[in-house]
Amino acid sequence: MRALARFALCAAPLAVALLRAAPAAAIERNFAGSAQLDYLFVPDATSGPAGRDVYDGFTTEVALKLAADLSDHLSANVKVCYGCHGFELPMAYFDFRVADELVFRVGRFSPSFGAFNIRQDPANHATSDNPLPYDMGRMLRLTQWNLGVLPSPFPDNGVEVGGTHWFGERAQLDWAAYAISGFRAPTGATDLLWILSQTRSGNLIDNNGRPGGGGRVAATFRFGDGNDVTVGGSVMYGTWDPANRFYYLIGGGDLSARIGRTQLRLEYLVRRQTFPVDPAVPFKLPAPASGQDQFEKHGAYIEAERAMTETVTLLLRADGLYRAGNNPLASPLATRAAVFRYTAGGTLALAPGLRLKASGELWAFTNDVPYHQELELAFHLSLVGTF
């Protein structure tokens, strides 16, 4: 109830402003939403090597969005979602468009990074969960890995400047640069604490007063009707501790192609992060004399999606995570550890705006990369609706 109350206090004033900002004839509004009920069955959820380190069973994800065009140059968006994290306010911002090539975004939003973030809503992709580089809590052994490289969505407070430029009718360039509060963790932590960036944490104030920043550039080339290729690159940097001593640097590249009824997608992410070494905590590798160590977390996925008919879509995906670097002796992960996942799934349209999703996953965990040491199975069945 407290989370719901906080959301109401945050979102209600902006929603009222959107609804009453101008006479009905002068403002265009759009209200949309989606809901997904997913059941995740993991046969070894309680008896496997990691124990019950997964959000299996039923989970619900709901998203409601209100968008309004206040004028030819000003628009506003508010979005609330509900899921395993409780209530969240991932979107509450204004866009001021000077031209197609220059748009200012101010408020709370997910900064431009990667290609998946654009379609991270469950209604916009064929599987029940995110690719592993962007995992937000549906992966197996989630606490061991502390989610993905960059859990999506990743809303933050700040400002973004971006735009789109067309080169004729066949080529398009998108760009964005932003300054945000940045990810954070308390003093002495060895990894980011993602909950501190979420509304449910109850405190969205920057812990060190120094903004993080980054940007993205993407180019799209069109080859006839229904055929295009997009290539993009993204970067993000910030300090995460109260004293601004330790940093994270995230980079990514993406490639996607649409060829008739088939879509191909490939993304690669890496996060390099420094952290303090506590002399009282034993680590697996000798600690540097400086008291500062680092690790890298890599993630990638490749998937092919094809619309077989007007109602049936099939998907194949391979994705994984790889961590390299020092960690506490108590961690079950070695200094070189990886997880691989192989997914086959599909969707069935039951009615306009209503789809059934099903997928099977083979997981492989290893502390001896690239060998697959421990195998687990998982199965998703979900129903998703949009309006």
List PLM regions with ranges.
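Outer-membrane beta-barrel pore domains
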Residues: 49-51, 92-96, 117, 126, ...
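Short, contiguous, pocket-lining structural segments
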Residues: 153, 202-212, 243-247, 254, ...
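Bacterial N-terminal signal peptides that target proteins for export
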Residues: 1-12
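Juxtamembrane/transmembrane-helix boundary motifs at the membrane-water interface
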Residues: 42-49
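Sec-dependent, cleavable N-terminal signal peptides
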Residues: 15-18
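Loop-centered beta-sheet repeat module
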Residues: 185-241
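Outer membrane beta-barrel
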Residues: 27-41, 53-185, 209-214, 218-225, ...
